Amino acid sequence: LFWRSFTHWLGGMGVLVFMLAIVPLSGESIYLLRAESPGPSVSKMVPKMRTSAAILYAIYCAMTLLQILFYRLGVLFGWGEITWFDSLCLAFGTAGTGGFSVRNSGLADYSAYLQAVTTVFMVLFGVNFSVYFFLLRRRFRLAWHNSEVRWYFIIIFGAIVLISANLLLTGGFFPTVFQTIHHVAFSVGSVITTTGFGTAD
């Protein structure tokens, strides 16, 4: 299961991008990077393609580690129970946006906190990674004016509001408003990023 999760994670950013980051490059490497990396403007990040690929993978790794850290904080503060093995595999499945889970029930067995962490990171891993590079370089205006990202979050927010309202008005699905919004947000994040995790029918 770990190997399956790891290869899933490795392919999330693209195996070719990984290779570009660690092996000598030719003049044709720009085409590989454009084809394999998420986001249309990655080639404009820095002049050298190898540097661009390394930056993308550094961001990808840092976000994966951050998700694992939030899982472990949940265990530390008693907000949920999850093993190190499950933490790693779920983080890999979230980062790869393919939703590979080590349990048959997906994330339904985990606490609301652990599900919320997964929701946030599903959405974050669905963002164009060049935007994170711009944020790291403090080019906030360029990141903010990215129409792809703005519409991405507008669609997510709108879907959560509309679906939650529909479920609350029809009634009987979840016992509380919080649980309704919680499960809807998770499902919307899962669907829009094609991750495919589930918490409820």
Q: Where are the model-predicted features located?
A:
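Membrane-proximal intracellular helices of multi-pass ion channels
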Residues: L1-D201
